[in-house]
Amino acid sequence: MLDFGSGAGLPGIPLAMAKPDLAMVLLDSNSKKTRFLQQMVIELPLPNCLVVHARVEKYDEVFDQIVSRAFSFLADIATKTAHLLTADGEILAMKAQLNDDELHQDLGAFEIATVQKLNVPYLDADRHLVTLKKR
């Protein structure tokens, strides 16, 4: 699984902790963030995590699942990660605000498979999990 634009490691670090059998790649283009992630992987320890400092456009591994949180519009996520996803893979995008305009954007080779509203304890704001699949 790839957590791209990992930032502080969300959701990649909690997923790796909850599923130690899951190989997780934490990808970010910001070296300060990847140094922080590397230290977390060492300290926790999380042997199932690999931290990669690279731009998503330049990275070339292939994954069955890609997760993203607070990155950008769905169309941008689909465009930037299309080359990293297997033919039957899926992108799991965590979104806060989700409006009709974004849901009807051209997603290129992708389509929206599901939109699930999430309930976050102690948070009175909308959150969604959008699953994208290749057409």
PLM regions and their residue ranges:
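Conserved beta-strand signature within the Rossmann-like core of class I S-adenosyl-L-methionine
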Residues: 88-98
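Active-site capping/gating segments
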Residues: 25, 96-135
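Helix-to-beta-strand junctions that scaffold the AdoMet/dcAdoMet cofactor pocket
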Residues: 19, 85-87
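Short glycine-rich, flexible loops that bind phosphorylated cofactors or substrates
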Residues: 74-75, 100
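Short beta->alpha hinge that forms the Motif I/post-I loop of the SAM-binding pocket
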Residues: 28-32, 73, 96
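Short, conserved active-site loop motifs that form the nucleotide-linked donor/cofactor pocket
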Residues: 49, 89, 113
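Internal catalytic or translocation cores that form aromatic/hydrophobic pockets or channels
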Residues: 75, 81-83
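Conserved SAM/SAH cofactor-binding pocket of Class I
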Residues: 1-68, 78-79
